[in-house]
Amino acid sequence: MTDTMSAHMDRHNKLDYDGSEDEKKTKLCSLKKKAINASNKFKHSFTKRTRRNSRVMSVSIVDDIDLEELQAVDAFRQALILDELLPSKHDDHHMMLRFLRARKFDLEKAKQMWTDMIHWRKEFGVDTIMEDFDFKEIDEVLKYYPQGYHGVDKDGRPVYIERLGQVDATKLMQVTTIDRYVKYHVREFEKTFNIKLPACSIAAKKHIDQSTTILDVQGVGLKSFSKAARDLLQRIQKIDSDNYPETLNRMFIINAGSGFRLLWSTVKSFLDPKTTAKIHVLGNKYQSKLLEIIDSNELPEFLGGNCTCADKGGCMRSDKGPWNDPDIFKMVQNGEGKCPRKTLSNIEEKTISVDENTTMKSDSFAKNKFDAENTKFIPMIDKTVNASTWPTNLHKSNYPEPEDLYSAVKPSQRRGGEGYLFGGVMSLVMGLMTVVRLTKNMPRKLTEAAIYGGEVDKAETTMVSNQEYMSMVKRMAELEEKCRSLDNQPAAFSPEKEQILTAALSRVDELELQLAQTKKTLEETMATQHVIMAYIDKKKKKKKFFGF
C-alpha cells in the first residue's frame, strides 16, 4: 500500500513538473515574441524619426580610379609628404592624379608643378579668397562678358557657357580692372572645386572633376584682340594651366565661321590627338550635336534647348545646377561630395575577395592549384611603393621616349593645361594664326608623320649606330631646351607692331563709320526716290483721268 501511494505521488509530481515545463516554454515563447515586436517597433519608429528629422541622406560615390593610377598617386603622395608639400586640404588622390596626368606621369615634373601651385596659392591668398574677396561689379561684368554655368550634361558634368561674340572688352575694363577680374576668376574656380563639382558628384553618384564648355564665337572679330584683352587672357591662361590642370572634359566651339574652321583644320594636325579629341569646332548647325551630350531641359533655349530660366533673369544669370539644391548643398558642407582617400589596401583587398569568390565555385583541386600558381601575383597590403624607382613601367630604358622627342612641337600638352574660359579660346585663335604663319611652307604630311609617328610606306630602313643615335638625342634635347626657353618668354608686341595694330584698328573703325554714314545716305536717297516715284505715279493717274 505504501508502495502504491508513493508511486501515485511520483506520477503526480512528474505531471506537475511536465506542466511547469510546458508553462515555462509558453511563457518564454510569448516573451520572445513580445521582445521581437518591441524591437521591430523601435526600429521602425527610429527609422521614421530619422528620416523625418534629417532629410539629408548619405550617398555612395563611385570612384573609377584604377590600381595603376592609384600606385602612381601613392608614390607621388609619398614624395610630397617627404618634402612637406602636402597640406591636409589638398590630400586628395584625384587632385594629385590631375597633376600627374598633366605631366604625363613624370614624377619630378608633376612635383615641380605641385610646388609652384602651393607657393602661388600662398602668395595669391587663394585659401581665403572666397571669404575675403567681394566682387561687387559682378552684374556689370556679366553684362559686358556673358558667361556662367547652366545645368549639367548627360554624364553629370557641369556645363559652362560663354558668348564671346557679345564681349565688349573696352566697357569691361571700364567697370573693373584686370587684377580684380583675375581674382574673381580664381574665386569662381575655387567655388567650382569646393561646391559645384562635389554637388555634381553627389547628384550623379560618381566622382566628377571636369566640365563641359560651350563657346559661342559668333561675332568675334579683331576688336576682341585689344591690348587689354590680350593681357587678361594671358594671365588667366597661365593661372589655369599651371594651377588647375585637366579640368576640361570637352569643348564645343559653335557658330564658327569658315575662316575659323579653316585655321582649325590646318592647325589640328600639329596638336596632340588627346587635346584635339576634346575640342569640337561646329558651324551654325550645332543643335543636334549639343543635344546628344546635354538634355534639352538643361540646355538654354538660345542654344537649341527648352530652358529659359525666365524667373531668374535668363539662363546666363541663373547659375542653374544641383549645387542649388538645399539637401545636396548641406551634404557638400558636410564633406560628403568628395571620395574618401583610397589606399592600395582598399583595391588589393577587393581584388583578393574577388579571387576568393571565383575560386569558391570551382572544385577543391582546382582551388588549390589556383592558389599555388597565383600566390605570387597577389599584391601585399603592407607593401609600400618606392618613389625613387617609380614608375618603372613608364621608362623602359635610359633613352628618351619618342613622345619626349617631340614635346617641343606640342608645348600646349607639355604645359598640361586646357585653357579655361575666354583666355583659353582667345589664346587658341591667336596660336592658330601664329602657327599657320610660321608653318605655311612646311609639308603637312611630313609634319604629321613626324608628330604622330604614323605608319607610312615602309621602305628599307638603314641601321643607325649608337653614336649617331646619341648625337641625335643630344641635338633634340638642345632644341627642346631652346624651345622651352622661348616658350617661357612673355609674349609681347614691339612698339612698332603695336602702333601698326592700333592704326589698323583705327582704320577699321573709320571704315565702319563711313560705311554707316554711306548706308544712312543711301537709305535717305531711297526714301526720296520712293516719294518722287509716288508723285510721278500720281501725276500719271491724274493726266489719264482728265484725258490730256
UniProtKB/Swiss-Prot annotation:
Presence of the UniProt keyword Transmembrane in the record: no
Origin superkingdom: Eukaryota
InterPro entries in alphabetical order: CRAL-TRIO_dom, CRAL-TRIO_dom_sf, CRAL/TRIO_N_dom, CRAL/TRIO_N_dom_sf, PI/PC_transfer
Topology class, membrane: Peripheral membrane protein
Tissue specificity of this protein: Predominantly expressed in flowers but also slightly detected in stems and immature siliques.
Coiled-coil stretches: 465-530
Gene Ontology CC annotation, any one: Golgi membrane
Location of the CRAL-TRIO domain: 137-311
Segments of skewed composition (Basic and acidic residues): 8-20
Keywords recorded for this protein, A-Z: Cell membrane, Coiled coil, Golgi apparatus, Membrane, Protein transport, Transport
Region described as Disordered: spans on this chain: 1-20
Keyword DNA damage (UniProt): no
Location(s), subcellular: Golgi apparatus membrane; Cell membrane
SUPFAM superfamilies: CRAL/TRIO domain, CRAL/TRIO N-terminal domain
Gene Ontology BP terms: flower development; protein transport
Similarity field: Belongs to the SFH family.
Its job: Required for transport of secretory proteins from the Golgi complex. Catalyzes the transfer of phosphatidylinositol and phosphatidylcholine between membranes in vitro.
Name listed for the protein in its UniProt record: Phosphatidylinositol/phosphatidylcholine transfer protein SFH3
Upper classification of the organism: Eukaryota, Viridiplantae, Streptophyta, Embryophyta, Tracheophyta
